[in-house]
Amino acid sequence: MALAHPRVKAGLAISGIYDLEPIRHSYLNAKLGLDANASERNSPLQQVAGPDKPLSLVVGSAELPLLRKQTSDFAAHRAVLGLPVTYEEIAGADHFSIMDEMASPQGRITTLIRQLFERTVV
């Protein structure tokens, strides 16, 4: 993840996939070509450590169940590891409409970005 880069101070992930193993067993893998090692190596949910930087995870309440579950699971995983994390479901948002919350100056995602920036700027 880019969050590990030394110049990155914080992150925001929107409607992500944090465990690639289900993808490896789907039709999508015909194009991706993931093997078990690549799936594990590139799945944040499978890591036993992570960057000690703030990460906000957001997902729409109208997203696919897999996206909501993986986002919630990843937030819990980071919390267990003692890593700074927030989790939020955007009411009524799906994989496309959730971006409206970033396009609007008063949108919830815009607010989260602003808060992350304020917390991490020295």
Where on the chain are the PLM-derived regions?
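Residues at alpha-helix caps and immediate loop-helix transition turns in enzyme cores, especially N-
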Residues: R24, L67-Q70
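Primarily recognizes the serine-hydrolase "nucleophile elbow" in alpha/beta-hydrolase
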Residues: M1-K31, S39-E40
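A general structural signal for stabilizing positions within well-ordered secondary structure
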Residues: A2-L3, Q46-Q47, A79
